[in-house]
Amino acid sequence: MKLALWLRLPMIALLLAAGLTASASARQYPETIALPNGWQPEGIATGFGNQFFAGSRNTGGIFKGNLKTGEGDILVPGFGGAATGMKVDRRNRLFVSGAGTGTARVYNARNGRLLREYPLTSAPTFVNDVTLTRKAAYFTDSQKQQLYVLKLRRHGRLPANAKTLPLTGDLMYDTNPDTFELNGIAAVDRKRLIAVQSGTGKLFLINARTGDTDEIDLGGETVTNGDGLLLLGRRLYVVQNRDNKIAVIHLERSFRRGEIKRFLTDDDFDVPTTVAWKSGYLWAVNARFTTPPTPDTTYDVVRVRP
């Protein structure tokens, strides 16, 4: 008995050390990070190092912060536009959806310099979210059944114009123009994308070349109020904004079927909309849609253990 205990002591020590390391790691990052008062965020993206970006849906401004220190400053001042979904690519460029402006913008993520602005479509429109592959950027429109594509040129150079990709197949938009349709989007690879339809709570696998869509079978379940998506391997995180939770879905190898395994919640959630990944944590931004916005309304980013 004593020998068995003696043999187990090194393992116990290792487990204790691992627990202490994880605890210390968690303490290195704040649980919440304040954004400027009145900011009205919607999208979040992580960049190089501990950088993160949060856009203002009210002004189009971009806030740049540090996930470790919680400090930050305005990278792009508001200009009367809008900034919703966003992503940073490996060339440190920030791709930003322009919501009702019908545009997309690409910034230098280091200094905030505008590299290019793309007019994508005319009203009615809501350019909602964006995902990146090595070859292209894909933007969703919550009011038009189509994607907008920025096909990168050689060495990742930005294109002169965007292209429109009509969506066909299983996805069907409601005839009511006020219905909020396709929202968050994530790339499986260069050929396949996944997007969520907010109103129905359905997920769709999209052929990135043809625009053909197939509904992903969730065994009869849905993710209503689905907003931002994050895909890590075959694990898909779906932010359900007004439900104040994040669905964790395990997808099969074909990405045509999946199962909701669990839900992540947090006491600090207040209508989270999008989520990003960095340093072993999810980082969700609170849009606070149910709180009347004022210049003094507070907003923040929440660290979530996956």
Located regions from the model:
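Asp-box/WD-like beta-propeller blade repeats and closely related beta-sheet repeat scaffolds
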Residues: 102-146, 167-170
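Beta-rich, blade/repeat-based domains predominating
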Residues: 36-52, 78-94, 121-138, 170-193, ...
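A short beta-strand motif characteristic of beta-propeller blades
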Residues: 28-35, 70-77, 113-119, 163-176, ...
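Conserved beta-strand positions in repeat-built beta-propeller and related beta-rich domains
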Residues: 52-59, 89, 94-101, 138-143, ...
